[in-house]
Amino acid sequence: MAAPMELFCWSGGWGLPSVDLDSLAVLTYTRFTGAPLKIHKTSNPWQSPSGTLPALRTSDGKVITVPDKIITHLRKEKYNADYDLSARQGADTLAFMSLLEEKLLPVLIHTFWIDAKNYVEVTRKWYAEAMPFPLNFFLPGRMQRQYMERLQLLCGEHKSENEEELEKELYQEARECLTLLSQRLGSQKFFFGDAPASLDAFVFSHLALLLQAKLPSGKLQAHLRGLHNLCAYCTHILNLYFPRDGDEVPLPRQTPAAPETEEEPYRRRTQILSVLAGLAAMVGYALLSGIVSIQRTSPARAPGTRALGLAEEDEED
């Protein structure tokens, strides 16, 4: 008997089954199709077989990490939400997927990862509290830099060199995109009628994050909340497909203090050694990945003196 497929994705929060755009899209598609997956929700990407989230481990042990490729594999396994779509609807799916990536995704990245107030009070706060130590000290900042690079690639076609003008242009296009989605949805349950398709999984993941997060700076969020059919659309999908999901990451259980036994010193020593081993592994990873670099000082300094330079920006709250 073949091993079951396994999906590794980011944990839930803000009333959503996952706080990550890609993880939420894949999770939603699997609920639409009823794909039999063993789902691992985690706030530690190192628990994924690829070291990234989301990731699908197939029944033959292959690991797939790109959301589009994960969905393509599920289609090959006969879990196809687009099976009944016409050729015209298939073309519309491609057009709206491009619209989401070009017009809405850049502003979502800006809203959650670039806007200083939102990043500090919402995004970094969630990841820093959810991630295990010591990942929570450097990984949110590393993710932010990756999203900055992704945003630069997405905005390559925009000619404005003024940052304020560029931001204004991006938000205007995102508002137009939301309005167009609202008009296309109309009074339907889903974008192509009464049954959900892959487009619904991606639209929902983009809208739900923006709708559910409590953002101190929510310019686009205010526009979305004014489009009542899109809000009802998100609520309908959450209630129908994720009725028991979306809780915040549970806090570690507090166990009552027990009297110290003869084995307690040995247990403590084992715990300390485990922590030290974990820290050593983290430092090794940081050195290999370039997060931390060791630079030799100039000859003018005393022999043997070294300078430890942090290659990444400070992650202090």
Swiss-Prot record:
Transmembrane segments: 272-292
The keyword ATP-binding is annotated on this UniProt entry: no
Keyword set includes Kinase: no
Keywords, comma-separated and alphabetical: Isopeptide bond, Membrane, Mitochondrion, Mitochondrion outer membrane, Protein transport, Transmembrane, Transmembrane helix, Transport, Ubl conjugation
Cross-link for Glycyl lysine isopeptide (Lys-Gly) (interchain with G-Cter in ubiquitin), residue positions: K38, K41, K78, K168
Tissue expression profile of the protein: Ubiquitous. Higher levels are seen in the kidney as compared to other tissues.
Domain of life: Eukaryota
One annotated Gene Ontology cellular component of this protein: mitochondrion
Compartments where found: Mitochondrion outer membrane
Assembly, per entry: Interacts with MTX2/metaxin-2. Associates with the mitochondrial contact site and cristae organizing system (MICOS) complex, composed of at least MICOS10/MIC10, CHCHD3/MIC19, CHCHD6/MIC25, APOOL/MIC27, IMMT/MIC60, APOO/MIC23/MIC26 and QIL1/MIC13. This complex was also known under the names MINOS or MitOS complex. The MICOS complex associates with mitochondrial outer membrane proteins SAMM50, MTX1 and MTX2 (together described as components of the mitochondrial outer membrane sorting assembly machinery (SAM) complex) and DNAJC11, mitochondrial inner membrane protein TMEM11 and with HSPA9.
Family named by the database record: Belongs to the metaxin family.
Protein purpose: Involved in transport of proteins into the mitochondrion. Essential for embryonic development.
Full protein name: Metaxin-1
Annotated organism of origin: Mus musculus (Mouse)
Gene from which this protein is expressed: Mtx1
